[in-house]
Amino acid sequence: MKPVFLDFEQPIAELTNKIDELRFVQDESAVDISDEIHRLQKKSNDLTKSIFSKLTPAQVSQVSRHPQRPYTLDYIEALFTDFEELHGDRHFADDYAIVGGLARFNGQSVMVVGHQKGRDTKEKIRRNFGMPRPEGYRKALRLMKTAEKFGLPVMTFIDTPGAYPGIGAEERGQSEAIGKNLYELTRLHVPVLCTVIGEGGSGGALAVAVGDYVNMLQYSTYSVISPEGCASILWKTAEKAADAAQALGITADRLQKLDLVDTVIKEPLGGAHRDFGQTMKNVKAVLEKQLHEAQSIPLADLLSRRFDRIMAYGKFSEQ
């Protein structure tokens, strides 16, 4: 797959194109230009490190939405075995913006639930661009309650712009579905591990992100509203999105300082989409450690900690 570069990555894109051209020349001729290729590769890596070491919150938001970033089904394929997808909420319909089912993690049976976006236009429409309707959240809850019944740990992957704001979704109880999930997750009698892998958009993300451990990938975001939405409300123009992103504090490192996130999972150079394999290794290492820890904590303590975590959301201090 040809890499897609964001606007602030254009200097990297130019070097990458030049490297590709030199490789083509070397393949088509007897001229050895490997030293020049290696020099440009090092220059590209150094430039990428420099750019990504000083990303603004608005740029991190762009990376979190990158079209080639790994989605929930990519993590399921890489980290789990024997995945059996489960469908439907048993009330209205099957929402393809939420995927989930039974799987094995290192041989242990677990329940996996997550948001799913699409790669191409057809799939994006089918998945509703990763924005669940009420039936999606009710499906997620049905799966998590099934996990509780059989004593299976729950692992969730969060990647959504937010809950779908359509009229039909509101008529079918969007806010009730999200609120019910928050309530039930605080009292679910099994370990719950949550990982933000892309966008963590408001209540649409929180509905599957109440857990014993909450992780974020290095270039993922988590906020009550998108920077563009915030700017449109406060300044009446989306052009102020960069200012909104700065004020919202949407980045993983900022949220970890506020004790809203347990672990920030390091991404490969250039973001998770540049090296799926390394990304999966990093995520797996964290989940292995946390699952072992969660299963060693008495259930009463686990539930108390989980409840205290969500009740701490929204607290603030004036400086």
Swiss-Prot record:
Superkingdom of the source?
Bacteria
Q: Return the InterPro entries for the record.
A: Acetyl_CoA_COase_a_su, ClpP/crotonase-like_dom_sf, COA_CT_C
Please state the pathway this protein functions in, per its UniProt record.
Answer: Lipid metabolism; malonyl-CoA biosynthesis; malonyl-CoA from acetyl-CoA: step 1/1
Q: What is its main location?
A: cytoplasm
What processes does the entry annotate via GO biological process terms? fatty acid biosynthetic process; malonyl-CoA biosynthetic process
The CoA carboxyltransferase C-terminal domain is annotated at: 39-293
GO (cellular component) term, any one: acetyl-CoA carboxylase complex
Name the catalysed reactions.
N(6)-carboxybiotinyl-L-lysyl-[protein] + acetyl-CoA = N(6)-biotinyl-L-lysyl-[protein] + malonyl-CoA
Q: Where in the cell is it found?
A: Cytoplasm
State the family named in the UniProt similarity comment for this chain. Answer: Belongs to the AccA family.
> What is the name of this protein?
Acetyl-coenzyme A carboxylase carboxyl transferase subunit alpha
In the UniProt record, the gene name given for this protein reads accA
